[in-house]
Amino acid sequence: MLSKQIPLGIYEKALPAGECWLKRLTLAKELGFDFVEMSVDETDERLSRLDWSREQRLALVSAVAETGVRVPSMCLSAHRRFPLGSEDDAVRTQGLEIMRKAIQFAQDVGIRVIQLAGYDVYYQQANDETRCRFRDGLKESVDMASRAQVTLAMEIMDYPLMNSISKALGYAHYLNNPWFQLYPDIGNLSAWDNDVQMELQAGIGHIVAVHVKDTKPGVFKNVPFGEGVVDFERCFETLKQSGYCGPYLIEMWSETAENPAAEVAKARDWVKARMASAGLVEAA
């Protein structure tokens, strides 16, 4: 795997739903992916993973060892429901406890990167106080992550607070900690009024992984590849020329589709063709 040009992964929510990780990783391997990104979202079902027993955690580690397909990253979107910027102390405390559990979980199962959602609050009105609480919550979270040697990486969002790499870099400079980095989503980055290529270049040295999806202005999910505004080839070329050698993750939500594997295979082929045009992978 280390000799490949780039590692290519698939988001858990692109694959059939269920809690059997051996099946999920086996399917990902059959589809030609190097890794799967786990989702811990705001649903009780996925949040409960943070309370897995020792045996359940070992089953995930065993599935990785058996298949050779890694689970190196977690998309932690549970903070929509329990935001670090909440003015409700009980909600904010729960958000910090979720962060602590996620970092401990990552340490236990070998996850290296936790992607954070850049919302001070999501279902409430933001203000100066929510942003201040969010910054303080990030500082506390990064302190915990440092002790565990787990990287927290901020996603570029569908939300004005964190809708550019430049804004996320402001937090990186504020925190000034090697365990806080950036995890841009080229779809989200392209849906706003950003100079996308300049933004990607600005993030080099801090980008630990890249989400790959298509978007339209105001539409951040479920846009079929090729039907949105993202200039994939230019993004891939910019990242390559800037020296980025890390993983790319195809982000999809096809777990409830009639045939998720077919949807994923179609998207994989489309993305890899653009990667080949940019010189990231060999043409099929």
UniProtKB/Swiss-Prot annotation:
Keyword set includes Isomerase:
yes
Q: What induces it?
A: Induced by L-ascorbate. Repressed by UlaR.
**What would be an example GO MF term here?**
intramolecular oxidoreductase activity, interconverting aldoses and ketoses
Alphabetized Gene3D superfamilies for the sequence: Divalent-metal-dependent TIM barrel enzymes
**Catalysis: reaction(s):** L-ribulose 5-phosphate = L-xylulose 5-phosphate
Q: What is its EC number?
A: 5.1.3.22
Q: To which pathway does this protein belong?
A: Cofactor degradation; L-ascorbate degradation; D-xylulose 5-phosphate from L-ascorbate: step 3/4
Q: Which residues cross the membrane?
A: none
Top enzyme class: isomerase
Alphabetical keyword list? Isomerase
Concerning InterPro entries, the annotation shows: L-Ru-5P_3-Epase, L-Ru-5P_3-Epase_Enterobacteria, Sugar_Epim/Isomerase, Xyl_isomerase-like_sf, Xyl_isomerase-like_TIM-brl
Keyword flag Isomerase: yes
Any one GO biological process: L-ascorbic acid catabolic process
Q: What is its biological role?
A: Catalyzes the isomerization of L-xylulose-5-phosphate to L-ribulose-5-phosphate. Is involved in the anaerobic L-ascorbate utilization.
Q: Which family does this protein fall into?
A: Belongs to the L-ribulose-5-phosphate 3-epimerase family.
HAMAP family in alphabetical order: UlaE
**Name of protein:** L-ribulose-5-phosphate 3-epimerase UlaE
Which organism encodes this protein?
Salmonella heidelberg (strain SL476)
